[in-house]
């Protein structure tokens, strides 16, 4: 698991998956362009929807929950990044 800034995410020109793990209300209100929504409490129920062949960027409010989930996914062989500081950074 690696931490990346929003700027590093924006510079990554590869095909990638960006996942917003905040509440649905916050996702609807505002999110990163093209981000998929999976609420953090339900994340592991949707693990089969996440392709291992793409880099995955996760973000939450502060970076704490995305760090925790990213660590789990890293152990399962995903190329996973947690956005440092969360959505507002």
Predicted regions and their residues:
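Flexible, polar/low-complexity N-terminal or interdomain linker segments that lie immediately upstream
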Residues: 1-30, 40
């Amino acid at each position: 698991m690696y931490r990346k800034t929003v700027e590093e995410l924006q510079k990554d020109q590869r095909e990638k998956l960006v996942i917003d793990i905040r509440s649905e209300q916050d996702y609807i209100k505002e999110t990163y362009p093209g981000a998929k929504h999976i609420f953090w409490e339900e994340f592991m129920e949707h693990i089969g929807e996440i392709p291992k062949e793409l880099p995955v960027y996760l973000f939450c409010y502060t970076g704490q929950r995305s760090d925790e989930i990213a660590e789990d996914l890293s152990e399962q062989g995903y190329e996973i990044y947690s956005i440092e500081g969360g959505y507002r950074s």
